[in-house]
Amino acid sequence: MAISATELPIINEALTKVGQRRITAAQLATPDNKASNLAVDTYENHRDQLLEDHPWNFAIERASIVKESTTPIFDFNYEYAYPDGTTPADKLYALRILKINDDLLWAWGQWGWIPQPGFSMWKSEGRKILSNIDTPLEVRYIGRVTTYATMSAMFKDLLAQKLAMEWAEPLTGSTALGTETERRFTRKLGEARSIDGQEGIPDPIETSSWLMERFT
C-alpha cells in the first residue's frame, strides 16, 4: 500500500536527524533520489515493526469477528481470520493479536493478575486465530495505524528516531552516526514504553500452562 502523505513529517524529521534534505509528497509518489527511494522501500515495514513491538495505546483496536467456514485439522474447533482492514468494516488491519475473549478469565489478586481455572487456550497461526470459542470471537489487537493525527506525539518522535537509525549508514555512509542514532533510539524506546504503560491498569500477562500450574 502507498505511504500516506500525512506521514511525511515523520519521514522528514528522520532525514533531518541524519543531515539530509527533506523530501516532498511528490517524491513519495515518484521517488527521484536516494532518500525518497529509501523511504518508499522501507518506511512502512519499519513503522509496522515498531507498532508490533509494544501494545501502544493509540494503536489498540477491538473487534467482534465471525468464524471461517473451514476448521482446524486438530486441537481446536474453530478458526477466525485476522481483521484485515475491510472485514469487519471500519476496523484497522491487525498486525498482532493481543487478547481474545476466551483469554479473559483472570482475577486481580494480591500479586497482580492471577489466571483462573477453566479458561481455554488459543493460538495464532498464519493470520488465523484458532480457538474453541464459537462465533462471535471478541479480539483485542494492535492495528496498522497510518494516520499521522492518530499516532501519539511520543510514538511519532520514536518512529522518526528509528528511521534515522535505519537510514543513517545507507544515506551517509557513517558508521559512527549509525551507532549514535541507535543509542538514541534505544533510550527513547525504553522511555516511550514506560510512559505508554502507565495509562490505565496493567494488562494481565499471557496465559501459559506454567502459570496454571503455579497458581492452582
Question: Residue ranges of each PLM-predicted region?
Answer:
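Glycine-enriched, solvent-exposed interface loops adjoining structured elements
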Residues: 1-216
